């Protein structure tokens, strides 16, 4: 099926090269990189050169590539590339060039088990643990902290204290857990694992781990053992479009519950979500059952801020689950699942009927003086004053004929910075960065745009002054805007979705869990009255 798998950095240097079928020349990696560099923006993720098919994905400034002479489904190749990158991240703790080079022996061992003669075999982190025995080497903590976003997420709360290095560590660490199991696998256990491929990974992983460790669903989960913990991220991305008069034309939320599990024994867990949510995949629930949710089992959630609007319910347009939660939603918005070890997305959802935005944007563009435009941009934070965004970046396109530009800030100039950059890839842009804007606060940027008057002056020699001035002015106005916002708000859920509890089924022991919320912008655009 697949002949070669290799990883290149953004300079074209080979980090990993694995040849499965030996039917393609060894310089295929050089041919691939030369083609990518020559095509640049026109490159496609799948292409053919001299009868060789190349399929690749790019992650963390690295190229993950498959080559084959056969006609293989591209979607299959992309899925395997994504799974391979996920496995490498699970076993090396971070998907970086340095981590891969440091653990190249481990990665080659993983690739040997991943495919046999180019045919996919085992693509699950849990399943591969039975056959991989090389201990991972972890990058120094200082370097991990710079790559980790855990510390950025947790700066907004003073009750959760999670060192970043705990959230970035290899799954198969070879510590207390691996010394007792792994080497004492029975023949029956190994045969069960070998027979389970790609689509049945979760079940095989559960049987394997329970048989090797000999523990029940809640065995060994204690606060003293830091290896038994689970990290949960509730991430939401906003797509918002404001009209020139300030009304909302589009407001959509795309969210997911991302998990990273270090729990041993694959215990069955139950996750409870906010009862205010209505999912189209389940029937209407009796409101009297909402009081049955166990609010005392909230773990790792503190100071979570919700939108100030009193929204009673949200209708989720569509959602999808990970294979470990095959039964979907249970009564009272609970999800029962058995988490596999490593990174996985438990739930993805989309909300299109949202009527709340964390920022209110107003713009006003005037042209009172010839060859000058006055633009006023007002941004108001629409959330609790306890919430502080990590960053806010505002980009404002201006005409290409801009000769000079002046600006002034009404509030908080010490925490804000305005830069004007000419001849960027997107044209002339004004960048406005806001370091700190608490909830309920407002900031105003006033810009005076001075454009080159050569065009209008030459037109005035042949025609009356008024008509050319209107034409030129209307053309230049269309080159101003739209305004784009980029932001990230920690410990904030725009949809008010909250994780009410996370507990272990059939056991009184609660797993160690760390829950975080993050809301950021996918596309937040405001038009200008052109």
Swiss-Prot record:
The primary location reported for this protein is: Golgi
PROSITE patterns cross-referenced by the UniProt entry: MHD (PS51072)
Q: What's the superkingdom here?
A: Eukaryota
Q: List the keywords (alphabetical).
A: Endosome, Golgi apparatus, Membrane, Protein transport, Transport
Record's compositionally biased regions (Low complexity): 173-186
Membrane topology value: Peripheral membrane protein
Q: CDD domains per the record?
A: AP-4_Mu4_Cterm (cd09253), AP4_Mu_N (cd14838)
Q: Which GO terms describe its biological process?
A: Golgi to lysosome transport; intracellular protein transport; protein targeting
Checking Pfam families in the record gives: Adap_comp_sub
UniProt GO cellular component terms:
AP-4 adaptor complex; clathrin adaptor complex; cytoplasmic vesicle; cytosol; early endosome; trans-Golgi network
Q: Where is the MHD domain?
A: 227-527
Instruction: Write out the annotated subcellular location.
Output: Golgi apparatus, trans-Golgi network membrane; Early endosome
Q: What are the start and end residues of every segment in region (Disordered)?
A: 164-187
Q: Which InterPro entries match?
A: Adaptor_comp_med_subunit, AP2_Mu_C_sf, Clathrin_mu, Longin-like_dom_sf, MHD
Subunit-structure text: May be part of the adaptor protein complex 4 (AP-4), a heterotetramer composed of two large adaptins (epsilon-type subunitand beta-type subunit), a medium adaptin (mu-type subunit) and a small adaptin (sigma-type).
Instruction: Report the sequence similarity comment from the record.
Output: Belongs to the adaptor complexes medium subunit family.
In terms of PANTHER family, this protein maps to: AP COMPLEX SUBUNIT MU (PTHR10529)
UniProt function note:
Probable component of an adaptor protein complex. Adaptor protein complexes are vesicle coat components involved both in vesicle formation and cargo selection. They control the vesicular transport of proteins in different trafficking pathways.
List the protein's name: AP-4 complex subunit mu
Q: Which gene is annotated as encoding this protein in its UniProt record? A: apm4
């Amino acid at each position: 099926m697949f002949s070669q798998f290799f990883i290149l950095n953004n300079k074209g240097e080979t980090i990993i090269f694995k040849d499965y079928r030996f039917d393609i020349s060894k310089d295929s990696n050089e041919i691939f990189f030369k083609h990518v560099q020559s095509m640049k923006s026109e490159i496609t993720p799948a292409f053919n050169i001299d009868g060789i098919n190349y399929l690749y994905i790019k992650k963390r400034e690295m190229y993950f590539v498959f080559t084959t002479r056969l006609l293989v489904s591209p979607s299959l190749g992309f899925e395997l590339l994504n799974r391979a990158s996920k496995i490498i991240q699970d076993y090396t703790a971070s998907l970086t060039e340095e981590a891969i080079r440091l653990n190249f022996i481990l990665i080659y061992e993983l690739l040997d088990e991943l495919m046999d003669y180019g045919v996919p075999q085992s693509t699950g982190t849990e399943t591969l643990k039975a056959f991989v025995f090389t201990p991972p080497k972890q990058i120094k903590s200082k370097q991990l902290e710079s790559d980790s976003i855990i510390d950025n997420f947790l700066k907004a709360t003073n009750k959760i204290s999670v060192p970043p290095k705990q959230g970035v560590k290899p799954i198969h660490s070879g510590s207390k857990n691996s010394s007792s199991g792994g080497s004492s696998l029975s023949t029956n256990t190994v045969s069960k694992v070998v027979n389970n491929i790609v689509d049945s990974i979760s079940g095989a992983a559960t049987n394997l781990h329970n048989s090797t460790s000999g523990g029940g669903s809640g065995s060994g989960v204690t606060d003293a053992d830091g290896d038994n913990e689970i990290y949960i991220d509730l991430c939401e991305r906003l797509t918002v479009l404001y009209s020139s008069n300030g009304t909302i034309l589009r407001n959509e939320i795309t969210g997911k519950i991302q998990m990273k599990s270090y729990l041993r024994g694959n215990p069955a867990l139950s996750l409870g979500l906010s009862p205010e949510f209505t999912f189209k995949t389940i029937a209407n629930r009796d409101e009297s059952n909402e009081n049955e949710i166990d609010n005392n089992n909230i773990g790792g959630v503190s100071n979570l801020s919700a939108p100030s609007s009193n929204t009673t319910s949200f209708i989720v347009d569509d959602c999808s689950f990970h294979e470990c939660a095959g039964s979907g939603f249970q009564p009272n918005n609970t999800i029962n699942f058995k988490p596999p070890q490593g990174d996985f997305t438990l739930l993805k959802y989309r909300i299109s009927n949202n009527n709340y935005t964390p920022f209110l944007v107003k713009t006003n563009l005037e042209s009172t003086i010839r060859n000058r435009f006055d633009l006023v941009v007002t941004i108001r934070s629409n959330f609790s004053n306890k919430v502080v965004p990590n960053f806010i970046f505002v980009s404002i396109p201006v005409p290409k004929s801009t000769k000079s530009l002046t600006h002034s800030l009404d509030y908080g100039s010490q925490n804000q910075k305005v830069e004007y950059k000419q001849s960027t890839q997107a044209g002339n842009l004004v960048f406005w960065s806001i370091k700190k804007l608490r909830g309920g606060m407002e900031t105003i940027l006033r810009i005076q745009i001075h454009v080159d008057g050569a065009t209008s002056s030459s037109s005035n020699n042949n025609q009356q002054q008024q008509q050319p001035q209107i034409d030129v002015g209307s053309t230049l106005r269309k080159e101003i805007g739209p305004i784009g916002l980029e932001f990230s708000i920690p410990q904030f859920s725009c949809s008010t979705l909250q994780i009410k509890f996370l507990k272990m089924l059939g056991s009184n022991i609660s797993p160690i869990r760390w829950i975080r919320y993050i809301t950021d912008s996918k596309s937040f655009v405001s038009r200008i009255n052109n």
